[in-house]
């Protein structure tokens, strides 16, 4: 049995009552998931203390062992959810071998969650170039300096690599490295979840058999 001081206690009736959404209006009033997601993300941007666009990205390695990490959503539209990374990182290699992924957004301030599952495809070079150019110069230099996910001798070694790349580019442009780009998760399913008292949560599930099909909408038991 784990230390009961480490794990939060199970809420009692009074505690559950305090978690009730003050806005009792129906929040699943969209029949298109991307529009509903845009509504929720807009609300989260106003209430989350930081990084409302943070999402857990789950992939799997060649043996099928799952892997998960937090990344930042950088674009979303009817085609899917976009993030950027070093293509030579662990997630880059896993997605190259198995182009499928799952996402999870969890906004504590809203007591809401969105789960996404789907196929993964690379963004275009033009998209990657445009986003890379929008980043801070030091971040662009860092993308050249960091051999992401590979062993690092010391923090000093990283800082030396950053200084070397900064000197190499001088005052000139810092182009996008060939090993740095983005991926788009094209959903086959999305689930929208809202916390409700006594674990009687609201769940709305959107799914489709393929990317060209229309969405089926199903309310799920909690």
Swiss-Prot record:
GO molecular function annotations of the record: FMN binding; pyridoxamine phosphate oxidase activity
Coiled coil: none
Chain sites annotated for binding substrate: 74, 131, 135, 139, 199-201
E.C. designation(s): 1.4.3.5
PROSITE patterns cross-referenced by the UniProt entry: PYRIDOX_OXIDASE
Keywords: Flavoprotein, FMN, Oxidoreductase, Pyridoxine biosynthesis
EC main group: oxidoreductase
Cofactor binding comment, as recorded: Binds 1 FMN per subunit.
Origin: domain of life: Bacteria
Keyword Oxidoreductase among record annotations: yes
Presence of the UniProt keyword Transcription in the record: no
A biological-process GO annotation: pyridoxine biosynthetic process
Pathway: Cofactor metabolism; pyridoxal 5'-phosphate salvage; pyridoxal 5'-phosphate from pyridoxamine 5'-phosphate: step 1/1; Cofactor metabolism; pyridoxal 5'-phosphate salvage; pyridoxal 5'-phosphate from pyridoxine 5'-phosphate: step 1/1
Catalysed reactions, semicolon-separated: pyridoxamine 5'-phosphate + O2 + H2O = pyridoxal 5'-phosphate + H2O2 + NH4(+); pyridoxine 5'-phosphate + O2 = pyridoxal 5'-phosphate + H2O2
Residues holding FMN: 69-74, 84-85, 91, 113, 148-149, 193, 203
Paired cysteines (S-S): none
Complex formation: Homodimer.
Primary role: Catalyzes the oxidation of either pyridoxine 5'-phosphate (PNP) or pyridoxamine 5'-phosphate (PMP) into pyridoxal 5'-phosphate (PLP).
Protein family per UniProt: Belongs to the pyridoxamine 5'-phosphate oxidase family.
Name of the protein this chain belongs to: Pyridoxine/pyridoxamine 5'-phosphate oxidase
Species per Swiss-Prot/TrEMBL record: Maricaulis maris (strain MCS10)
């Amino acid at each position: 049995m784990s230390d009961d001081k480490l794990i939060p206690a199970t809420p009692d009736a009074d505690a559950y009552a305090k978690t009730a959404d003050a806005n009792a209006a129906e929040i699943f009033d969209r029949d298109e998931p991307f529009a509903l997601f845009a509504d929720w993300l807009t609300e989260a941007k106003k209430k989350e203390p930081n990084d409302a666009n943070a999402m857990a990205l789950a992939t799997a390695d060649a043996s099928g062992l799952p892997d998960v990490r937090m990344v930042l959503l950088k674009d979303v539209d009817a085609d899917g959810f976009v993030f950027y990374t070093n293509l030579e990182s662990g997630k880059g290699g896993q997605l190259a071998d198995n182009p499928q992924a799952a996402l999870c957004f969890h906004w504590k301030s809203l007591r809401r969650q969105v789960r996404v599952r789907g196929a993964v495809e690379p963004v275009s070079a033009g998209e990657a170039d445009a986003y890379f150019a929008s980043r801070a110069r030091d971040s662009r230099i860092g993308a050249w300096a960091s051999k992401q996910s590979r062993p690092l001798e010391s923090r000093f070694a990283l800082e030396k690599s950053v200084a070397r790349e900064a000197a190499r580019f001088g005052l000139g442009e810092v182009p996008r490295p060939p090993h740095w780009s983005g991926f788009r998760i094209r959903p086959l399913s999305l689930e929208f979840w809202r916390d409700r008292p006594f674990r009687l949560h609201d769940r709305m599930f959107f799914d489709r058999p393929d990317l060209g099909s229309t969405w089926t909408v199903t309310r799920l038991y909690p």
